[in-house]
Amino acid sequence: MDELKRSVIIIAAFGLTNIAYAQSPQINTTIIGSGSPDYNPERVSAGVLITQGGTQILVDMGDGVKRNLEKHGVDGRKMNAILFTHHHLDHNADFSPIFTSALLGRGDFLVAGPKQTKDFVNNNINLYDQDLDYRLGKTQRSLDERLDHLTIRELKSGDRFNVDEIKVSTLSVPHTIESIAYRFDYSDQSVVITGDLSAGPGVAKFAKDANCLIIDSGGMIMNKRGKKQRNKTLKSEGKNGAQKGKKQHAHLNIKESSQIAADANINKLVYTHFVLGEIDKSASMKIIEQQYKGEVIFSDDLMSLNCGNKTTN
């Protein structure tokens, strides 16, 4: 009888463990847009979707991101957070339709980013207030009512907050305007999205031991540009950071990004924000592998990433 009771207890405990696991799925990361400001029929502009269970977080929404979200089957009315790395057009051009979808939902949601985010969002609301009221009126709701469920937040380096069970932290990174990198942690999984940046201090520490580092592909060698681009990349190695009395570069190069990944002990280095043209992966990898020995991914639109438990490189 005692043996039977022990068996029942073990089976019940195993069942509860499985239920808990089912209720706490891993982070899923999808590159919604892997392109740059250039029009590219194969890549839309910047966007990354982080999901965990029913939680949806969109980081950046350049031109074409709304269309790719639809292709991916995302219900924009259930978006929990819309985050900007910075306010360049290739990172925020699709905000209006994505924001409208979130407003037409019924849950609370957050819009956050660096300085000017509040003005950007409020200008959008003021411009489209009659249209938004009309759309919401079809379900007997008003814009004022829905705005009670919206939080707009301007972020600075070192801010920490939660979106449901996902922990979010921020780091200011050097670019041509104020820019923020994000880190998402859930259980033992972590994803870092840098947005656009030039070389600067603190990124490796911020990204330490992350499963996936999604980073600016500045300086990537492209077949279309051939030897000229390759020589430019090699010449600029280690020189793209901000230096006293010298011009601030908009983007780091692949030696610098791969060094960050190595210093941070990253599991997977994921490149995005590609310019128009064909990537010379072989030539680029020769530079990257001098610093970083882990897995390297050249992302494409709608690519799903496995940013789960870390494996030994």
Over which residues does each language-model region extend?
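Bacterial N-terminal signal peptides that target proteins for export
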Residues: M1-V8
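Conserved beta-strand hairpin/beta-sheet module of binuclear metal-dependent hydrolase folds
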Residues: Q23-H72, S179-T194, C212
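Metallo-beta-lactamase
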Residues: Q26, K115-S179, S187
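Divalent metal-coordination and catalytic microenvironments
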Residues: T29, V48, D60, L69, ...
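Active-site neighborhood of phospho(di)ester-bond hydrolases with catalytic His/Asp-centered motifs
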Residues: L58-G62, M79-D90, A112-P114, V192-G195, ...
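Active-site metal-binding motif and surrounding structural segment of the metallo-beta-lactamase
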Residues: D63-A112, D209, L213
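Cap/insert and terminal regions of metallo-dependent hydrolase folds
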Residues: S190, S198-M303
